[in-house]
Amino acid sequence: MPNDAAGAHAGHESRHGCPGGAGRGCTLEPRADPGPGVRRRHQDREEKARWLRSVFVATYGEHVGCGEVVVVRAPGRVNLIGEHTDYNEGFVLPAAIDRDVMIAVRARRDRVVRVRSLNFGETVEFTLDDVRYDHDHTWSNYVRGTLLALGEAGAPLPGMDMVVTGDVPAGAGLSSSAALEVATAVAALAVAGFDLEGRDMALRCQRAENSFVRVNCGIMDQFASVLGKAGYALFIDCRTHECEPVPLPREYCIVICDTGVRRGLRDSEYNLRRSQCEEAVMLLRGRGMRVRSLRDVSPRELARVEAWLPEAVRARARHVVLENERVLHSVEALRAGRVDEFGRLMVASHASLRDLYEVSCPELDAMVEVALGIPGVAGARMTGAGFGGCTVNLVHEDAVDEFRRTVLTRYTRKVNPSRLSFEPQVYVCRAEDGAGVMTLEE
């Protein structure tokens, strides 16, 4: 972060702090029995973990290495609201979802690391004494970078064998990369017998993606994967790293619709949007405002000075400033049980991303339009960086079956099939617990 932290308005820090004044931890009230559907998913996950352990033994042998085979998991995440605010030190409201990356791992007696990816059908091998970027197996760099970051944190990592699998769709904006990083961290720390506080682990995983993989991501993805709680979204302050659990309505499901479009312009356009936000801050400082980031600008303050900003920069700044306000209002609405209000905020967020930040695409717009025409949908918006990927929808549990039957049929009638890289998909999700070691009953 910049060193001119004192330049931010002190009043903004209190106005834009975590509602309720959360400290470093997330304090949760116990929830009632989650119901048979959740229990069934947990049983299915345990069966998958036992299967993965058997694949591990078939791959590496029963008694090779040292110690037991450990199975860990880390979830993907969906951002409910708060898009392109994280790198502006703003606010986000993600939820960990019940799609995850699983790793079976066992320590070795040397410094060699072997990783078998079932999704890619590939195996890589390297030594902890010489961790280098792999241009041929790019998926493995999330593993390599995470192990390197943990070693830099002082974790006494042994060599290890891993088998990795996952059902988080890649490239869809659901943070499959963060899930792989976090699962790697949990697995490595488990076999090393080394404890790392959840936030520290998330920050190490972010460091791996920033420094080793060279993707300039914010903290949201890793925080959600580590700190997620079943039945809750996480309100995250991307400046202070404070988080608060926000209860989600039990009678609603998170439904993710994959447009089938992958984000060809994402990297260049993402970098452009980020530079435009930085330009806005520089220009606002030139007008005498003491701001460190767009997080420090209120809608009223922006309205007074936005005429001085170039048109594109003005639009980007307006989105970020108003999106931060939408996140804060969303937290209040969800805490008060005002689902319809939260849904309206989701729709407003999508319109802002489409018209002001200009990161939507015809397919995302079509998916949102179709979803909002189906009964039982409280809200819908694009989620992720944009230019393709997924929408997130809040759908009443009684309407989910009809939604699944209807949404893709109507969507495919509205879009050009030649633009689709993959078959569109619908994923019905619930907010899930964050990463951890799995306990398997024999």
Annotated model-derived regions:
Residues R73-V78, G82-E89, D167-T184, G376-L394:
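Glycine/serine-rich anion-binding loops at beta->alpha junctions
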Residues E152-D161, A188-R204, H396-R410, K414-S418:
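Phosphate-handling active-site elements
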Residues R77-V78, R99, R109, N119-E122, ...:
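Acidic, glycine-rich active-site loops and adjacent beta-strand->loop/helix elements
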Residues E68, Y87-F91, L128-D136, G166-L174, ...:
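A short glycine/serine-rich beta->alpha loop
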Residues G173-I256:
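Fold-level recognition of mixed alpha/beta catalytic cores in primary-metabolism enzymes, strongest
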Residues T123-L157, D161-V168:
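Hydrophobic alpha-helical hairpins/lids featuring a short glycine-rich hinge
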Residues E89-A96, R273-R274:
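Short Gly/aromatic-enriched secondary-structure transition segments
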Residues G25-C26, A32-R77, I81, M102, ...:
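C-terminal nucleotide
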